[in-house]
Regions:
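Terminal export/targeting leaders at protein ends
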Residues: 1-84
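Short, cationic, amphipathic peptide segments
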Residues: 4-11, 80-106
């Protein structure tokens, strides 16, 4: 959770970015700490440490394989970044944004 607090501005900017190309550019140039912060948030989501609404859960249900791969710490940084770059739809990112809001409220 400390990593989430340190990388809060980056996470907010990347989750709120509506333009796909800008978001991909931000992810491409993100450093290891920033990618690890996204990975940690996803891991907390998968371990059910973050209470999320059923609506958010339904948004993210379609992306369960990607979430598992991003949350898996055994995967290299490059591989986790590639999985995040492949996500082009808004459902994945808006679901993670709702998850981030739930993390910050706690």
């Amino acid at each position: 959770m400390r990593r989430l607090r340190r990388q809060r501005p980056f996470l907010q900017s990347i989750l709120k970015e509506a333009n796909q190309k800008k978001r991909q550019k931000m992810l491409t140039h993100a450093n290891a700490d920033q990618i690890n912060a996204v990975s940690e948030m996803v891991l907390n989501l998968l371990k059910k440490r973050v209470p999320i609404k059923p609506k958010t859960f339904d948004k993210l249900k379609r992306h369960k394989t990607v979430l598992r791969e991003v949350g898996r710490r055994r995967n290299s940084l490059k591989r986790r970044r590639e999985y995040l770059l492949k996500q082009t739809g808004r459902g994945f990112w808006s679901g993670l944004e709702d998850c981030f809001k739930a993390c910050c409220v706690r």
